[in-house]
């Protein structure tokens, strides 16, 4: 628990990164951000992060901190029709749109002093935005850790995947909810498993050829009745 004797005014006056880091470690606050995002911390960011954590634990309503994690949707459009997703079902009343790079740049410029993590996805397929790689690179230049989640069920133009992998992206999440087309498309409707696997293989090849340690590749399967017989096989697939 947070030391009740340590108030926010005291923290605001601390000018030692190491002291602030120690307080975060003692209170296990770093669990709220990806461990690889710690490399982008500076004095201003860690101070805001610590204050935000204390305000959250104290259920504060009058906040002095700013958000240390942002979710920005490059688009709310998607190429799939997943039945449990409002976008896939067409249930959302929001008009489909694409985030312009100028608007994204403004968000980063306003948040770069305190934003630690940026998740560039929410209700759409982020790679449908032609400026996605440019967005990732701009966030990377401003020391912001980035993550996207993609279905990877699109045939991309030459060099797109290489540009994505070398953009500064920190983590790429891909859900593969079946190891054959019949099972895969029961949830990932309109998706093509072969395309996904080809893209995955190409990403792995690029990272190996260029000896890159990022993006971290996170592959997952949503556990459902139709794919439960493939769970063990999927765990073996992930290790390859």
Predicted regions and their residues:
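Conserved strand-turn element in the central/C-terminal portion of the radical SAM core barrel
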Residues: 151, 200-230
């Amino acid at each position: 628990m947070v030391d009740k004797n340590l108030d926010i005014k005291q923290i605001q006056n601390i000018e030692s990164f190491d002291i602030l880091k120690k307080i975060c470690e003692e209170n296990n606050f770093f669990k709220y951000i990806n461990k690889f995002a710690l490399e982008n911390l500076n004095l201003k960011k860690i101070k805001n992060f610590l204050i935000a954590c204390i305000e959250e634990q104290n259920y504060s309503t009058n906040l002095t901190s700013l958000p240390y994690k942002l979710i920005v949707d490059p688009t709310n459009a998607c190429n799939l029709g997943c039945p449990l997703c409002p976008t896939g079902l067409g249930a959302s009343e929001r008009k489909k749109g694409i985030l312009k790079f100028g608007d994204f740049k403004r968000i980063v410029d306003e948040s770069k002093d305190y934003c630690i993590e940026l998740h560039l996805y929410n209700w759409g397929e982020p790679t449908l935005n032609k400026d996605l790689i440019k967005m990732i690179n701009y966030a990377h230049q401003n020391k912001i850790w980035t993550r996207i989640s993609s279905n990877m069920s699109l045939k991309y133009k030459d060099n797109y995947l290489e540009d994505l992998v070398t953009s500064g992206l920190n983590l790429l999440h891909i859900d593969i909810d079946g190891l054959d087309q019949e099972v895969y498309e029961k949830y990932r409707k309109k998706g093509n498993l072969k395309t996904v696997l080809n893209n995955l293989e190409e990403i792995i090849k690029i990272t190996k050829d260029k000896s890159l340690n990022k993006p971290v590749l996170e592959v997952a399967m949503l556990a459902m009745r139709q794919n439960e017989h493939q769970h063990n096989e999927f765990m073996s697939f992930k290790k390859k």
